């Protein structure tokens, strides 16, 4: 065939390919029946009630609401060095490299061939009756090929790869949200363990003073041995509670070291110096359902996985249609010693159409891709519903623990008033000193219960911030 005929054939194939070019498979949008589209999912929260809750948007760096420079520094260190975040960053780079690889499929493929061999070719292969001699054969060639994306298979593949990259990026944000919340939680537990130990130590001091009084009363004949034994038991019971707070502090300390990517020995002592519980100076800003679904990275991850699954339907559907590739080669083929002579020059241009018939396997792959997309939609709906459930649950717990705290504050205040009254009565000689110590013990118990609930309330706040999905953004607060 003459070169002009070859070029005309190539031009005709390219023209037909471009004329028929289309993109098969669904054009992705979030389905109208998705849970995220429901009006209730975009409305305010049912449990967002009371003065302690604000409908203002959640700040990007919510931990700064505690106004603790030490906590801010710990969170920054965790984001920079946490091992889970380092792994997530590596996964993201891998996904980005995969996108680059898929994008390269759109480019022409160019390759070179350099070959030398000693061989005897078959005479029959060249329609020659005689036996051919043994010679050194050589080949130098440049080859190029290009796939016409007639049905959008490459385009859908790029869409799937890009959506997968975005899903991996969202997974990295999920890890960051978790690490930030766990870091704040560990620091909260350190602070509250120290504070509760101080309260327990004060109660122990009161018990020891009560024991000393009981022993003095027994010595002067105004007490009983049973009262001394009772006081001794109370002292030992109170003393036994102190190691628990040390253990809780140490456990939180070691967990904090892990979150910061450090060995326990490398964590500064200042990390456990906190003895004042963290306090929010404002209502917790929670926003609404629309902001929640946009902010939570696990929702974004599931939605991007759905987009990737939808694009893969197009990839599978394109396999039902013919595939056309254009190719060209230019080189030298012949006896190695003769390479470069006109007789060894070769070139070729052409097109290749391939079509798998029957296509039962391709149709099955389309059905598989469609089923995978349906599963991804179900997963997306599940993540949305879980996000709403976790947020409402966290709000409910926080609200009810606030109510409990109000009652405990009142009980503590009443115990404090009684202790003050008994102290004045003792000073006036109207009541024995033992009654004042009993009132002091009641006050100490009320303070211990309140301190325990304060810790629970602080952990409720952290769980609420975690449910709201904040902490992955890199912007300024």
Show which residues each predicted segment covers:
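Sec/SRP-type N-terminal targeting helices
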Residues: 86-87, 103-104, 148-176, 226, ...
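Periplasmic alpha-helical coiled-coil/stalk elements that build and connect Gram-negative outer-membrane
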Residues: 154, 163, 170-288, 397, ...
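Small/polar, glycine/serine/threonine/aspartate-rich low-complexity segments that form flexible
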Residues: 51-53, 57-66, 114-143, 266-285, ...
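Transmembrane beta-barrel architecture of outer-membrane proteins
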Residues: 71-73, 137-139, 185, 230, ...
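Terminal intrinsically disordered/low-complexity segments used for targeting and assembly
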Residues: 2-11, 15-80, 138, 162, ...
């Amino acid at each position: 065939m003459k070169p002009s005929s070859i070029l005309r054939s190539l031009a005709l194939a390219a023209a037909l390919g471009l004329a028929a070019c289309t993109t098969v498979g669904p054009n992705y949008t979030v389905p109208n029946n998705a849970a995220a589209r429901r009006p209730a999912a975009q409305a305010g929260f049912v449990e967002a009630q009371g003065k302690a809750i604000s409908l203002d948007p959640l700040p990007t760096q919510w931990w700064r609401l505690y106004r603790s420079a030490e906590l801010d520094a710990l969170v920054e260190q965790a984001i920079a060095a946490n091992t889970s975040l380092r792994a997530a960053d590596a996964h993201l780079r891998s996904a980005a490299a995969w996108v680059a690889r898929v994008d390269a499929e759109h480019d022409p493929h160019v390759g070179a061939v350099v070959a030398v061999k000693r061989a005897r070719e078959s005479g029959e292969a060249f329609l020659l009756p005689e036996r051919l001699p043994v010679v050194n054969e050589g080949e130098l060639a440049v080859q190029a090929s290009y796939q016409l994306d007639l049905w959008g298979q490459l385009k859908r593949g790029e869409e799937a790869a890009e959506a997968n990259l975005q899903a991996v990026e969202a997974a990295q944000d999920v890890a960051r949200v978790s690490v930030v919340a766990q870091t704040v939680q560990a620091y909260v537990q350190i602070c509250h363990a120290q504070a509760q130990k101080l309260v327990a130590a004060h109660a122990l001091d009161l018990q020891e003073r009560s024991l000393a009084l009981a022993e003095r009363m027994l010595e002067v004949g105004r007490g009983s041995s049973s009262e001394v034994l009772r006081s001794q038991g109370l002292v030992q019971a109170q003393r036994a509670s102190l190691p628990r707070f040390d253990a809780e502090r140490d456990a939180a300390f070691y967990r904090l070291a892990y979150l910061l990517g450090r060995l326990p020995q490398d964590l500064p002592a200042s990390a456990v110096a906190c003895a004042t519980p963290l306090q929010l100076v404002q209502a917790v800003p929670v926003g609404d359902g629309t902001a929640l679904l946009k902010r939570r990275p696990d929702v974004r991850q599931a939605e991007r996985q759905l987009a990737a699954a939808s694009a893969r339907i197009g990839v599978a559907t394109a396999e039902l249609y013919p595939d056309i590739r254009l190719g060209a080669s230019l080189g030298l083929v012949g006896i190695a010693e003769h390479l470069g002579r006109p007789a060894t020059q070769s070139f070729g241009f052409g097109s290749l159409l391939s079509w798998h018939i029957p296509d039962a396997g391709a149709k099955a792959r389309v059905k598989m891709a469609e089923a995978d997309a349906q599963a991804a939609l179900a997963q997306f709906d599940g993540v949305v519903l879980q996000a709403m459930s976790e947020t409402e649950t966290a709000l409910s717990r926080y609200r009810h623990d606030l109510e409990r705290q109000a009652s405990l504050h009142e009980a503590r205040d009443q115990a404090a008033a009684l202790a003050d009254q008994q102290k004045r009565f003792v000073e006036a000689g109207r009541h024995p000193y033992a009654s004042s110590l009993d009132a002091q013990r009641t006050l100490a118990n009320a303070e211990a219960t309140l301190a325990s609930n304060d810790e629970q309330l602080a952990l409720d706040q952290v769980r609420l911030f975690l449910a709201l999905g904040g902490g992955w953004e890199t912007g300024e607060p």
